[in-house]
Amino acid sequence: MTVVLTGDDLALEQLVRVARGGETVEISPDAVARMEMTRAVVERVLERDLMVYGLTTGGGARKRVRVHADEAEEFNRRLILNHRVGQGDLASDEVVRGTLLRLANGFAKGMSGVRPELAELVIRALNEGPLPRVRTLGSTGQSDLPQMADLAHGFLDGFVLAAKEGLALINNNAFSSASAALAVADCARLLDALDVAGALDLEAFAANLSILHPAVAETRPYDGLRATLARLTDLLAGSYLWDNGAARNLQDPLTFRCLPNVHGAARDALAFVMRQVEIELNASQDNPIVVADEERLVSVANFDILPLAAALDFLRIALAPVLTSADERLIKLLQAPLSGLPEGLAVRDGLAEDSLTQFAHASQALTAEARLLAQPVSFELASSTHPEGIEDRTTMAPLAARRLAQMIELGERLVSIELVVAAQAVDLRNRPVLGTGTTRAYGLVRDRVPFTDIGDPVPQDLEPVRELIRSGAFSA
């Protein structure tokens, strides 16, 4: 399947398919015509010999320095080279592919004033490769200047840029937007897996399902809560927990009782952030922009993507209690006084070995690190002395996206432990009748990690379970 770029309707799932699935991309004829029209406006403005930021002047603190027509080619070359200050590891291929896609879609919008030939060059790098090498660190989010300079340097390959095209290539947030989109897609899969693990926890703990009573949705009309209640009810359809007397407690610990509420809040946050991502994937991030019907270029601040950066902060904050609760539930399953099962989920009481007890330390370490990553970053301050006090604020959008991705990786590892612990507890409860969804989840886990019997080592390699999460196996 080919994704056709119009500049207006690129969806999150399309970016994921292109970035990870290798789908090809092309630009719509209407978008090509729009780029030709706005480029003609740029050429006419050039003929008027006006002072226009980034077109006939330098950038940043050098906005007062005139760039003449015969200097444009060299100016573009140096602009890109001088911004290649990125540090750290190389971005993954999927992030680079997503960045190329977002850049091309921004050009297709027509506000950049670049020639269609440049947009086609971006598409060719995406479809045919080789992919540019892009460093991950160095952007404050007021345009991903270092990353976009790396990207442009990697695919231009002798292509001669026209006036404004150098600035259009680097003065945008395509790297942050693509990184955010991929992380948010992963977050959706993680939340699905957390629902499944949470449902299996309820059965492993022999918890009280009064928390799923329909009155909860009626009295607290949050979309995320309602969706979570419906999903947990479906996962637990047919479970022994619906039988009279199945629950061990009148009220369970809060991390069991509040599971729908906590997960629901995260789902509300996710829905909001997904909307922000899709807006940003199709919004102009340029400065200046071409206003065709006025035959002019207008200086703006479209590179300030605080709506996305703050939303990513919001999602991490909402995800932290979900992970903390998962950690607490699995630890309680390991504790005999709370679970009613042998300590550490050993085969029987009185054994000297720890069985799965030490998983509690691993889960606490993962959770502590994840919570630290939830700290908001979009309110960080830039130095007002650089350059000449002009660039005096930031969004830190790339950091916000990177921290979400790191938090999700930790979450995947935590949920892998949670699923294994819950499966062990279910086995020790003599394998009661599980729900339709939890039966499937239990089987998937047990196909990869067997029951831990007397003398068995702790199942340290949980990557097969993590791969289930990443594959979307728990999203069905």
Give names to the regions the model predicted.
Residues R39, A72, N76, V96, ...:
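Generic internal hydrophobic packing segments that stabilize the cores of diverse globular domains
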Residues D49-M51:
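Conserved SET/PR-domain catalytic core that frames the SAM/AdoMet-binding pocket
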Residues G110-L137:
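FAD-binding glycine-rich core of flavoenzymes that anchor FAD
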